[in-house]
């Protein structure tokens, strides 16, 4: 799953570990390093390209001919059929990534963005977050020492709000755990039909070794041609040196890259060297007849070597990904435990001025940290969607202002966006400035909306949170 033999995924960690605000209580911990979120845009685009290449691998002879642009008159030896089975497994893995891992990773980023904006608020719509409301409820508890009813209500609201955040943190912890499990399946396979990258890697290397021996640079056929041309060159050089008045030209054109795919062109007019003319003609015939085979071998084995390099990269960086999502799982567990401790804070501790001030400061600092992480998570999600389907296209957003609860909508239900959105509304990202008249949306179980003809990217708004987000674009 690689673009070409010169393009490989960077060897450094696939997923960046994180150092911003890691000491903030109630904060996001190590979820970002300040300028990279989970996976950088460039790495995500590269992974997407690898996966798309994997989806297009040839699994029969006709597909192989199309893939490497071989005409029907060029024969393909039967031993190349070894590729089809291993490519089929690689293709299955790529399909599994798209169906299972890709949505989970996007969902994990959405979880972080959703939680971050929930606790920190969203300045773009002047919406207060849960931490600001917790601060207000703490003020009500401290400032209403003589009003038992007001204190009781503030405590009830405070604990209920903490309970919501604890519940979501546990859900997101479980989601990160599921990603770790899925990554392990992707890399090592399962008991069903997913073979696993490491097993594909092993089989691919075996096929690569066999085909390189039969058709690569060290194959007997290529060695024989190389030796003949080498001997011919020596003979020509010796003859030319002996005949100072000989006007000749020997041109070697290395057209086939790493293999000996050159053609010898000889201009011989002097009778002194006519005795080697037959040798030259014979070598030329052999080279001409072998050219198609050499071209075939270069293309197919070059593709094989490139994909083998890609598999190596995916496996090593997949292992790094497991470590990071294990860490993310631990971060969510810590966040849940910290807020659980906050929920069980005693009334006496809250009413103590020093303790109350300390909690207020901690919530304020954590809110600032969450806002940064939430914005980065949202940006990452948009980049991930755009690079997975169409790279380098601008994201324009159109939103409906209707309150629609159906799963299918037509273009006439859309108007200029509003800032106060309600549940069951939609936001659409695409490269056009208007929707076609016959536009129709359909929603799948992952809350992803598809329009196959135009490849629209859809973002779902529900329960006061965006499933995805972007800057508004007024149509």
From Swiss-Prot:
One of its GO terms (cellular component) is host cell plasma membrane. Changing residue 259 to D: Loss of nematicidal activity. The keyword Ribosomal protein does not apply. Disulfide bonds join 88-451, 402-404. Keywords: Disulfide bond, Host cell membrane, Host membrane, Membrane, Secreted, Sporulation, Toxin, Virulence. Residues 250-268 are annotated as: Potential transmembrane region for insertion into the host cell membrane. GO terms for molecular function: toxin activity. The keyword Endoplasmic reticulum does not apply. Pore-forming toxin with nematicidal activity. In infected C.elegans, induces an increase in intracellular Ca(2+) resulting in necrosis of host intestinal cells. Also, induces the expression of aspartic protease asp-1. Interacts with C.elegans aspartic protease asp-1; the interaction prevents Cry6Aa proteolysis by host gut proteases. This is Pesticidal crystal protein Cry6Aa. The lineage of its organism: Bacteria, Bacillati, Bacillota, Bacilli, Bacillales.
